């Protein structure tokens, strides 16, 4: 038996060989990553890539995520997808070959997207070689082969979701596309493990927010018009109840003149009514004025006094005094009525404001309790499935 055969027959030799290959692959990955960092082009005279990396990291941090870098050795796409799928990138060659095999089986789906001057056989043969850069066709093939969705993060751009199946609630793999040529894996901000990533984009929240915004924009105009009409009708009714005036146009004119101040409108309407009553009283000619116009007839010693006695004279004077006193007494009564109306209106307005504040507090409490209940349900669902929801501001589906 030769030495090689003896070495192969020893127990544990296979595991040691696999361990050695794994370490060799890791060293090659570290060297490729260092070389890729040194050879990255610096746009704008230097520091451009570092600035892009910092901006990208801040963008992901706002979503509770971070970059897990993989070497830029031409295998970065399959390394990033493998890290998401398995928790490490050591099986990138296997993922590459499986993707190429799927593209060959589904040739009619992928051949139209190959460049015209390159035959399909040559394209897939080149893609099967380690270190060959893979593009969108490989991502689509990988997603369909594994029946999952791939979400691509880019700097200052919406998320791209490549759907590998039409099923809902399927697994998602999140990768980052940087520098126009490199892919990295995306992880939770505190995830340093070698476990598979479980990230799920909250597209439902995004669509719900968009529909809510459209509904608010649609109903805002109608609600504002209805509210304004209700407020005007309510103000007119209050002025009508306080003054007894049934002239709708007159009340509206006074409300507009007083800038819809209900108390000022009530005072204005009462003054106008008082002026109308004064004019009517002047046109009726009070009895005192008639007595005065009769002149000597009712004076002492006149014909009326001799015929009816001084009683008629006293009655005429009394009636005249009543007529003279009535305007001042009526003014006092109107002032008292105005004070009562104003106080009543003020109390009613205070009661309405208090009721409105109570309704506002009740609505806030209901919204808070509903939001806390929804957050509790979501936290329970995350704890059961161990999936991290990724918020997003915009998304594009492929």
UniProtKB/Swiss-Prot annotation:
Record flagged with keyword Nucleus: yes
GO terms classed as biological process: cellular response to nutrient levels; negative regulation of phosphatidylinositol 3-kinase/protein kinase B signal transduction; protein deubiquitination; protein K11-linked deubiquitination; protein K27-linked deubiquitination; protein K48-linked deubiquitination; protein K6-linked deubiquitination; protein stabilization
Modified sites of kind N6-acetyllysine: 66, 105, 122, 129, 220, 292, 322
Annotated Polar residues bias: 321-342
GO cellular component: cytoplasm; cytosol; nucleus
Residue stretches making up the OTU domain: 65-189
The UBA-like domain, residue ranges: 230-270
PTM summary: Glucose and fatty acids stimulate CREBBP-dependent acetylation, promoting its nuclear translocation.
Top-rank taxon: Eukaryota
Modified residues (Phosphoserine): 224
Region (Cys-loop): 70-76
One MF annotation (Gene Ontology) recorded for this entry: cysteine-type deubiquitinase activity
Catalytic activity: Thiol-dependent hydrolysis of ester, thioester, amide, peptide and isopeptide bonds formed by the C-terminal Gly of ubiquitin (a 76-residue protein attached to proteins as an intracellular targeting signal)
Annotated region described as Disordered, given as residue ranges: 1-50, 305-383
Catalytic residues (UniProt): 73, 76, 182
Description of its domains: The UBA-like domain has no influence on ubiquitin hydrolysis. Specificity is given by the S1' ubiquitin-binding site within the OTU domain composed of the Cys-, His- and Variable-loops.
Name this protein carries in UniProt: OTU domain-containing protein 3
Native species: Homo sapiens (Human)
